């Protein structure tokens, strides 16, 4: 009984978990997204039973696949949704009279804020025209350097 066969040595060398491999990042992602049984190696004698278990849809997986195409895996579906642009919400075109009146009161009749509306635009346009006419700061600096203008000491 002291001697051991070669098959006993191979079982001891690999340890008790020689058939199980360490789970990597992809395996953990697959488990997280509900594909835990897809990469298992079937054991001897249990192959038909494992196939039927793997192919039978569970309620969790069927519920999870309801919103996406069945040919996409959960990981592919996740990354497709992350990369696809979000759709802007559709604005309602028909509003009630009260909400339209409140909107006009807040935004003005032109759909702009009162500060930027027709009454306030004349002040900003006048300031802009003044700069266009050459009365801005840089223009006045350059005019100082011309002959016949500026302080008498520079003439």
Curated annotation (Swiss-Prot):
Record's compositionally biased regions (Basic and acidic residues): 37-49, 123-134
Region (Disordered): 1-70, 109-155
Reported function: This protein may function to maintain proper structure of myelin.
Superkingdom of origin: Eukaryota
Positions of modified residues (N-acetylalanine): 2
Any GO molecular function: structural constituent of myelin sheath
Record-given protein name: Myelin basic protein
Record's keyword terms, sorted: Acetylation, Cell membrane, Membrane, Phosphoprotein
Family under the similarity heading: Belongs to the myelin basic protein family.
GO CC terms in record: myelin sheath; plasma membrane
Membrane topology: Peripheral membrane protein
Biological source species: Heterodontus francisci
Taxonomy of the source species: Eukaryota, Metazoa, Chordata, Craniata, Vertebrata
Subcellular location: Myelin membrane
């Amino acid at each position: 009984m002291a001697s051991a066969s070669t098959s006993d040595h191979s079982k001891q060398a690999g340890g008790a978990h020689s058939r199980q491999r360490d789970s990597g990042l992809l395996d953990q992602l697959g488990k997280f997204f509900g594909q835990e049984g897809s990469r298992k190696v079937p054991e001897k004698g249990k192959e038909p039973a494992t196939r039927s278990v793997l192919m039978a849809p569970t309620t969790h997986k069927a519920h999870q696949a309801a919103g996406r195409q069945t040919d996409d895996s959960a990981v592919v579906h996740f990354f497709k949704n992350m990369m696809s642009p979000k759709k802007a919400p559709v604005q309602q075109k028909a509003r009630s009279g009260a909400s339209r009146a409140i909107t006009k009161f807040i935004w003005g009749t032109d759909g702009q804020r009162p500060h930027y509306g027709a009454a306030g635009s004349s002040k900003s346009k006048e300031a802009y025209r003044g700069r266009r006419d050459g009365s801005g700061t840089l223009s006045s600096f350059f005019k100082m350097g011309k002959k016949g203008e500026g302080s008498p000491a520079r003439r």
